[in-house]
Amino acid sequence: MSLLFKELDNSETVKRVARFFNKDYERLYLLAGSRLTDISSPALSQAPGHTSGNHNENALIQGITAGAMIDAVNDAISKCSYSSQVILKNLLIRKESWQDVKNQLYCEGHKLGYLRKRACLEFADAFDSAQIRHKCQPIVDLHVDKENDEGELTENKRVI
């Protein structure tokens, strides 16, 4: 056991990273890509506007935040090993087939499974510091800590 880091539940961390790419990444990408197209000049009319705040401002802030997160994802991927970069970009983001990715890496199926797990763990480690560098809020920790002796999950508090 490390003196600096809590012991990770690698399989749950891999699942969390995969879920991030399957569920969150595409939406972040769409939000980041739409940040400029959703903004329009305000139109003045005699009718009162709604009082729930400035929709254009909120859309801009959401787009900038999503853009920073996409930049952090790209930065984190660039810090990973070559095989991990190929897997993260082509298998998890572009949704290419396992066969295509195996051919790109010149490896067999069982080896690709191992490399995919390693890629997810590398990404989880690199993503923490990338979010800080890109001033993302909130910081999303993709790590899952192992259960303690009583079977409870330990809290996911890290000093970064």
Ranges and model annotations:
Residues L112-A130:
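DNA major-groove recognition helices of helix-turn-helix
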